[in-house]
């Protein structure tokens, strides 16, 4: 994680360093990234970099945690919008994330490039979705699904996030239109609902 010195930087300087890092991590895998290119783009002295981060892996993890924070905020907002009902979450999350990504397309493309360049990396290092799911489970209103035991609830949430992610990726990979992908997501959610509520 960044040092206190990094957090004491003026926000524009911090953001410039992070944008330089994001751009570089989107260009090459973490192992191939050049700290020199990052510090040149950020216009900071090389010695300063090591006052902010232990190494480029430390910086890489911090960049990914920022994406985690965006994802978690979107999930929590969607959960609140759907009355904390888990079976309403996929469509609410789909709509919110789709709108956000359309408004922030350039940043989303950089994020997707970071994931593609680091495909061989442990998935747990890329995004903290399992931890986010556990936080969501604590906030969900399980009314009507009280009969599900803890493992079943976890499996249900995993399924719901999987189908939502698949629906979003179908749109961004241009396999389906946003309308068709949403329709299929609603259908899948309906099938899961019938199984979960029985």
Segments (PLM) and residue ranges:
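Basic, helix-initiating cap at the start of DNA-binding domains
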Residues: 1-28, 37
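Alpha-helical DNA-contacting segments of helix-turn-helix folds
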Residues: 53, 60-74, 104, 108-111, ...
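C-terminal peripheral helix-coil segments that are non-catalytic and often amphipathic
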Residues: 139-142, 170-198
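Amphipathic alpha-helical segments that line or abut small-molecule/effector binding pockets
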Residues: 84-103, 158, 182, 186, ...
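Amphipathic alpha-helical packing segments from all-alpha helical-bundle domains
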Residues: 69, 118-158
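Alpha-helical structural segments
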Residues: 12, 20-23, 27, 41, ...
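Amphipathic alpha-helical segments used for helix-helix packing
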Residues: 89-124, 134-138, 162, 166-174
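Helix-turn-helix
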Residues: 16, 28-58, 62
